[in-house]
Amino acid sequence: VGYRPPPMFQIIFNEISAAEMSALPTELQLDLLAQFQILPEELDNLDPERFGRIVRDGSVLHRYRAGDYRIYFERAEEGIQIHRVLHKNTVRDFLYRSKLPMVEEDRSLAAKPGFWQLIDEGERARAPH
């Protein structure tokens, strides 16, 4: 009965989210990843102060607030799939252009097809090579 390491899982970036992340300064990338401490089994009981939950057609997309950035992700078989890494002003600009109230950001986003188009674009992107 020796030491058992925790089960391995991956944080998977698609082509778009990888490009969004790599466009950031290296120190900021490391800081965001250090803040993004989560295991797939924790997705059912996330702290609502740190995580948002956006539902569409039975699918659940999560939002993590890391400083001035928002990481949109979901549970995947291999671990956690990152769909987008956006500066908060990008989301706010989207909300402003959509004429949505800033309160209840997640519910407002879930109701707007343009937001899902942004996420779907990330989902369809191939993982970087």
Which residues does each PLM region occupy?
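N-terminal "first-domain core" detector
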Residues: 7-16
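Surface-exposed, Lys/Arg-rich phosphate-binding patches that contact polyanionic backbones
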Residues: 19-27
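Residues that form generic nucleotide/phosphate-binding pockets
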Residues: 20, 35, 118
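Negatively charged, low-complexity tracts enriched in Asp/Glu with abundant Ser/Thr
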Residues: 26, 30, 34-38
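A short, surface-exposed loop/turn module that caps and links secondary-structure elements
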Residues: 38-65
